[in-house]
Amino acid sequence: SDLQIAVTKVVDSLARQLIADAEGHSKIISITTVNAKSERDAVEIGRACARNNLLKCALHGEDPNWGRILAAIGTTNAVLDPHNIDVTLNGVKVCEASSPGQSRDLVNMKSELIEIVIDLHIGSAMATIWTNDLTADYVHENSAYAT
């Protein structure tokens, strides 16, 4: 419905603003899971990636490490075929059918926005999760004070 579309746009905008205001970040990361069996699976995969400190550190270091994305996906209970997952980073399909795809060197990791698309090829559900990278500034800001 029109109302649902309007509310979704507002909520998405608010989520982006929260991420952009996060202390010590250098990257804003969009993780979209498509063709999942259910929206629940798509959200679970996005959240697993968003919470993965190794992935967040790699993205801060501008390393398009799709293996860390697959590793995060592997921690979920989502329905998937582990041999048929595609990962696209900033428009470059670096992983196709869970194997190396296009060259990682083609991925522009310099921009503040990093867009990850995970294609499960198993259904029609999708979800987008927003997060940011893990930086030394973030660690410092959150460890340099007494509570």
Sequence positions of predicted segments:
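Unusually extended, aromatic-enriched hydrophobic runs near protein termini
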Residues: 1-6, 78-82
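Internal helix-turn-beta structural module
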Residues: 15, 35, 43-47, 51-147
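Oxyanion-binding "anion nests"
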Residues: 2-41, 45
